[in-house]
Amino acid sequence: MSDFSMETLKNLRQQTGVGLTKCKEALEHAKGNLEDAVVYLRKLGLASAGKKEHRETKEGVIAARVDERGAALVEVNVETDFVANNNVFRAFVTSLLSDLLDHELSDVDALALVMSSQEPSLSVEELKAVTMQTVGENIRISRAFYTPVNSGQSVGIYSHGNGKAVAIAFLSGSENQEALAKDIAMHIVASQPQFLSKESVPQEVLEREREVFSSQVAGKPQEVVEKITQGKFRAFFQEACLLEQAFIKDPEVTIQGLIDRAAKASGEPLKVEHFVFWKMGA
């Protein structure tokens, strides 16, 4: 039976910022004494990291990986750009991608509880505390993403600005179109579409845009209003929808046109299934 209460455990976690497992271990070692437990964690090099937990984190990196396990994306923030490029910090971020893929996770809280692939004796949360101790800054795992990659898919990743913006594009119909998928991912980072296609734009967004367009042409004849509104919607779709956008490397063709051209050349039924785009802090 434990020699400490849940309240003591909660206090130790709040005071040190150290993970649940190590806090339990510390309290068991200290026979429930909070101060002795803090000393125990300090000897392990963990407790002082907790003091950094409330520092603001505006810098960081977005990292992505695709392999046979699936596709993973994680954003991890720190206080300065200097630490964002630190090898110790980058190794921690890389290990998170392995953890997401190993455990098929998209939840930051769930990720914090799994045992780290980088240091199997520590949970991800505990390794984060150790890494904070090493680099001397607060670290925040802001968001995580995982999705399986199916057979017959090609996946492309593009990272811009040393991990400040990252896109992943998923194509169906072929496993041999990675170069095309990467080109589309690069385009996504440059053009930042909000939606995949016209059909995927939510109804409430369409209604909002229609209200805006209507207010801009109020007082004009109905047939003029309809014509102008159609033109404005066309421009909206060309700006907001990936498949309607002009390809950044060849503005004479849309992304849908690019896909159609590649499908005709390869004889494969290519299609952009979905994409993920993350920008630092967005």
UniProtKB/Swiss-Prot annotation:
Domain of life: Bacteria
Keyword Protein biosynthesis appears in the UniProt entry: yes
Gene3D superfamilies for the chain: 1.10.286.20, DNA helicase RuvA subunit, C-terminal domain (1.10.8.10), Elongation factor Ts, dimerisation domain (3.30.479.20)
GO annotation terms (biological process): translational elongation
Keywords: Cytoplasm, Elongation factor, Protein biosynthesis
Pfam families the UniProt entry points to: EF_TS (PF00889)
PANTHER family: ELONGATION FACTOR TS, ELONGATION FACTOR TS, MITOCHONDRIAL
Function: Associates with the EF-Tu.GDP complex and induces the exchange of GDP to GTP. It remains bound to the aminoacyl-tRNA.EF-Tu.GTP complex up to the GTP hydrolysis stage on the ribosome.
Protein name: Elongation factor Ts
Name of the gene this protein is made from: tsf
